[in-house]
């Protein structure tokens, strides 16, 4: 049905969609978890916050699991190289993700302030660490990752965990955290009442403005970073072999795609305008629009990074010609074809049941809801 080149492009788009879906849905879960000990001033308020995400958090995590599975199947070399290079960071992320269901399930089992406060901080950790690590990972991808391939296409990573925590990557990590917290705050503005609602509204406005500032700073910063350019001819229909190309480093090269394809400027414009609209909507008590604009903010930032790097997926700072691109590090044509058929069925199913759950379980929560469901609620 599709040729090899088209399948490669389709899966670049699909993985991008899965990452955006994760940021939009699991983003507000993590944002709420990060905010729970910050703006929840009483046990009841914190329970209200957690129960706004109770019907959705496990379903939202499907986006991340699916993205990981798609990365493994569609880009196996990228999967292997990234997990070996970001090994400690990946385990820190998984530890935080494992901690979240434990904290949600065990927090309300014992009516002891110290017990519940401990789990509140565990939830904050589970909502803060993953977005920072994801942002740091994207920041390092834009700078290049120190790996190389041998003749058997086996990757070897030459960096350290602390080398990943460079200034630009940390800026990207804080930006990701602000976007997720804004997502959580706008969600709470839609779902809560009274003082908790007001605090969430204030947080949404503050984090939105910080996100705009960080994104603009990052945009100017990336223009001074050495980007990657393919200088040889690459056969987009050939079997995957990252060693069959030449790549050079050029300062400001990540801006080339925006100059070549002006339509791509839509993404960074979204990354600046949508947080501003989210702040305005939040200020004027339009919670639904604030959440929508916050979601589009996440999409705009992710798309900006993807468009800037295209067709690179994982550049190598150690040996630029060993960089992994969407044209030479994918699975076979047969595998991509079979996966496309599966995705054509499963992605609409995921979208369908996700939409249905939000529709059926929409509404604001208040103290009365927690009191009436004291045993069953988180």
Which residue stretches match the model-derived regions?
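Predominantly late transmembrane helices and immediately cytosolic-facing juxtamembrane segments
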Residues: 110, 187-251, 267-282, 360-364
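Juxtamembrane interface elements at the cytosolic ends of transmembrane helices
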Residues: 27-35, 98-112, 138-153, 174-196, ...
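N-terminal signal-anchor module of multipass membrane proteins
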Residues: 1-59, 65-69
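Alpha-helical transmembrane segments and their helix-start/interface "positive-inside/aromatic belt" motifs
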Residues: 9-13, 116-131, 199-212, 285-298
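Membrane-interface transmembrane-helix boundary segments in multi-pass integral membrane proteins
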Residues: 203-205, 209, 255-265, 327-345
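Membrane-interface helix-loop-helix modules in multi-pass inner-membrane proteins
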Residues: 56-130, 141-148, 232-236, 258-259
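Short, membrane-exposed interhelical loops at transmembrane-helix boundaries
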Residues: 245-250, 316-336
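Membrane-interfacial helix termini and the short, flexible loops that connect transmembrane helices
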Residues: 36-49, 74-80, 101-121, 188-200, ...
């Amino acid at each position: 049905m599709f040729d090899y080149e088209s399948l490669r492009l389709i899966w670049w788009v699909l993985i991008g969609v899965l990452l955006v879906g994760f940021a939009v849905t699991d983003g507000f879960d993590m944002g709420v978890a990060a905010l729970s000990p910050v703006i929840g001033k009483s046990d009841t308020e914190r329970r209200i916050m957690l129960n706004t995400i109770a019907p959705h958090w496990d379903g939202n995590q499907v986006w991340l699991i699916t993205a990981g599975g798609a990365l493994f199947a569609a880009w196996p070399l990228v999967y292997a190289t990234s997990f070996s290079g970001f090994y400690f960071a990946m385990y820190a992320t998984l530890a935080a993700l494992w901690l979240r269901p434990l904290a949600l399930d065990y927090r309300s089992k014992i009516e002891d302030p110290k017990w519940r406060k401990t789990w509140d901080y565990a939830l904050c950790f589970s909502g803060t660490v993953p977005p920072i690590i994801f942002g740091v990972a994207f920041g390092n991808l834009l700078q290049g990752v120190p790996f190389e391939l041998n003749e058997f296409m086996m990757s070897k990573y030459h960096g350290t965990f602390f080398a990943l925590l460079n200034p630009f990557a940390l800026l990207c990590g804080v930006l990701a955290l602000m976007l997720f917290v804004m997502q959580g705050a706008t969600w709470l503005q839609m779902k809560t009442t009274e003082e908790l609602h007001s605090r969430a509204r204030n947080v949404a406005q503050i984090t939105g403005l910080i996100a705009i500032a960080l994104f603009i700073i990052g945009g100017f910063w990336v223009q001074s970073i050495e980007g990657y350019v393919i200088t040889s001819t690459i056969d987009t229909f050939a079997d995957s072999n990252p060693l069959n190309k030449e790549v050079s480093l050029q300062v400001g090269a990540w801006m080339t795609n925006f100059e070549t394809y002006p339509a791509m400027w839509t993404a960074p414009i979204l990354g600046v305008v949508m947080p501003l609209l989210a702040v305005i909507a939040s200020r004027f008590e339009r919670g639904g629009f604030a959440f929508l604009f916050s979601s589009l903010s996440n999409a705009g930032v992710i798309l900006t990074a993807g468009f800037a790097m295209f067709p690179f997926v994982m550049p190598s700072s150690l040996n630029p010609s060993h960089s992994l691109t969407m044209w030479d590090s994918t699975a076979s044509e047969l595998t991509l074809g079979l996966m496309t058929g599966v995705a054509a069925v499963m992605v609409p199913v995921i979208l369908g049941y996700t939409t249905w759950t939000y529709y059926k379980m929409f509404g604001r929560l208040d103290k009365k809801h927690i009191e009436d469901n004291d045993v069953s609620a988180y």
